[in-house]
Amino acid sequence: MIVSGLALGCDTVGHEGALLAEGKTIAVLPTPIDAPVYPSQNQGLADRIVGGGGALVSEYAPGAMLHDKQLVSNLVARDEWQPGLSDGVIAIETSVAGGTNHAMKHAQGTNTPIAVFDYSSRMGEDFYADERFGGNVKYLKDGAFPIFEASTIEDFKIAMESYRQRNFRGASGGTALGRDSQLNLFG
């Protein structure tokens, strides 16, 4: 399952990839659920997410009136909600100041596993010098799980499962709850 923010770029590609694979995806919105989708270019994608059995979620009550000045802080809040709905966070491409950093920092603060794409084997030293990947480089130095080929994505999935097993136990402290018992959004 893909949880992302419906932003243009990697978020859009992630949601569309999940739908193409007939998987589920959740879009965390920076606006109330009944407001126009932001960004408006992704209204059709939002409709396909819901039509495909996914979900649009928002922390803002339907009908809430939000001002344009609030959008920046809403975008940050949206980014911070995503790790809370996820077993792990993967950064595809982020600069040091990119919005992805809000999600990554929140994940680090809650000990949610993080991974970043490591393009150094393809780009060589250019990877470390390219500002578009400054955040990737930073998180790799901080110990994020490196993803550089398909098998490392599978390894990260194992790390996320281990995290879930350690952190989501029943009230009795017994065996770990299954995914469906933890969060059954899709019935």
Q: Predicted segments — roles?
A:
Residues 1-187:
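Glycine-biased, small-residue-rich flexible motifs in mid-sequence functional cores and linkers
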